[in-house]
């Protein structure tokens, strides 16, 4: 019985060490994501914003708490939304081959032309990482 308890204790310590390692890796990823020079927005496959980094907050001219849970579509200029929705549907199902295009954001009171690049995270249903780069 004591041998089994010792094995359980060792397994528990191994699992705890792995959890601590994963937490440290996640924190490192979050810091990298937040401080990346490029603007990144992560959405669910339906386009709802899950996360946005500091550069994206600057480009979109919105606070993070406003962005989280909002459809990315509402930040696209009205006349560009139909095209964005169509591309989002193709990207979300894995059908799109061209995942980079230009669109216009309605950023606060300004309109900003951006090159937008979408990358599927894992499986198409897992989510989409969007890179937004202002066009000069």
Regions found by a protein language model. Name each.
Residues 1-24, 135-136:
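Short, low-complexity N-terminal regulatory "tails/caps" that precede and couple sensory modules
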Residues 50, 99, 106-114:
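PAS-family sensory domains
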Residues 56-67, 78-79:
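PAS/PAS-like sensory domain cap-loop motif
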Residues 79-105, 117:
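Terminal output helix/cap of sensory domains in signal transduction proteins
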Residues 116-135:
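Short loop/turn elements at sensory-signaling interfaces that couple input to output
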């Amino acid at each position: 019985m004591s041998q089994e308890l010792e094995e359980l204790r060792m397994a528990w310590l191994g699992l705890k060490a792995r959890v601590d390692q994963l937490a440290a890796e996640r924190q490192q990823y979050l810091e990298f994501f937040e401080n990346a020079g490029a603007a990144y927005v992560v959405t669910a496959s339906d386009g709802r914003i899950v996360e946005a980094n500091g550069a994206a907050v600057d480009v979109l001219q919105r606070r993070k708490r406003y962005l989280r849970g909002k459809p990315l579509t509402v930040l696209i200029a009205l006349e560009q939304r139909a095209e964005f929705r169509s591309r989002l549907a193709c990207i979300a199902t894995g059908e799109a081959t061209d995942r980079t295009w230009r669109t216009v954001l309605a950023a606060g009171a300004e309109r900003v032309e951006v090159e937008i690049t979408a990358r599927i995270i894992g499986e198409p249903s897992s989510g989409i990482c969007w890179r937004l780069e202002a066009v000069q």
